[in-house]
Curated annotation (Swiss-Prot):
Designated name of the protein: Argininosuccinate lyase
Provenance organism: Pseudomonas putida (strain GB-1)
Major place of residence: cytoplasm
PROSITE patterns named in the record: FUMARATE_LYASES (PS00163)
GO molecular function: argininosuccinate lyase activity
Subcellular location: Cytoplasm
Amino acid sequence: MSTDKTNQSWGGRFSEPVDAFVARFTASVDFDKRLYRHDIMGSIAHATMLAQVGVLSDAERDTIIDGLKTIQGEIEAGNFDWRVDLEDVHMNIEARLTDRIGITGKKLHTGRSRNDQVATDIRLWLRDEIDLILAEITRLQQGLLEQAEREAETIMPGFTHLQTAQPVTFGHHLLAWFEMLSRDYERLVDCRKRANRMPLGSAALAGTTYPIDRELTCKLLGFEAVAGNSLDGVSDRDFAIEFCAAASVAMMHLSRFSEELVLWTSAQFQFIDLPDRFCTGSSIMPQKKNPDVPELVRGKTGRVFGALTGLLTLMKGQPLAYNKDNQEDKEPLFDAADTLRDSLRAFADMIPAIKPKHAIMREAALRGFSTATDLADYLVRRGLPFRDCHEIVGHAVKYGVDTGKDLAEMSLDELRQFSDQIEQDVFAVLTLEGSVNARNHIGGTAPAQVRAAVVRGKALLASR
């Protein structure tokens, strides 16, 4: 007869219940219950394996699996009573299973510890989350390709130091973000490979004395391989850290993109218009249309950076193997995944709806001597050393600043006062179209190269 006075699965060696505050303080069920589906998935695979090796009978296996599926239905219908006194998602489900099917439910945990159970749950969950995030990246990239194809010839100023630098096409600019997101996609795919290793069977830390078949469980759960060391399997969270690192880079890219969208929608730039459905107003200023979506994505980036820092700090001082510290791995991981997925979704919805203001973009590109490098290159082709050409054009720009004229607005005589190598054909070089069309190589801003990059991008997405 049980003498457990603690209402806990581990209460046999204790003589008094856990303090009520400590029970609440140490419980994780309020946040780890979102792992219920993966916990049940792992338990079904574990029960199947136990029956295969003779630890459970086929009838016991079937009873357990039916009970677990019923419990999943209760949870998804909102009819499950989550209890803090049962600590976590694992014990809540196991206790409910025992309530439903009796003593057979107590056999499910044979050859298993919550240490390898939770490590398995998190990996299963993260694997699914990465798949959802990858789908959102692809959707955003599709939107970028559509916009880039439409705007292959739309000219805008390119910037360095947020100062006008050279003319570029809007399509080319958008494709820069496509390239960054492609690397984000690759990082997450690579991260998924290392997350897709199965700790189940590691038990508490040293493995189990039961004749388990880890390869069978691995196959049932769709893992690529089993964890090769039981201590490592239960104790490390480097896969979660790696995910948060990849998520941080992706959010950094979205944050930079957000900053551009905020600038471009401002009265000072007016390069684009965001549809009203992605903006909000002011409670006091009737005229305001605020770009809240990109602003909020920019702000949320700090949460993901914080998750990465938090997980690194969490793990840095832990000896092998499992420690209670690891309970703190879930909330930052969950938040990082939620934030990245939601931010990508917002961008994937918003980017195809952006409306560029072509005339304003072009007018801005005509300011700031954006074709100065083209004039220097023109002189190089006339046989002058580049550094001399740089100096010559610098004097021409200074003259333009003093007279209020762009290079293309100067007469031939005005330009020739800086070099007698300048001829009438220079004006074809100094046009915006001449500037962008001249950069007609892979990775360049010429419209032909933008269209070629779009074709490559579509092929990349089709190959996923």
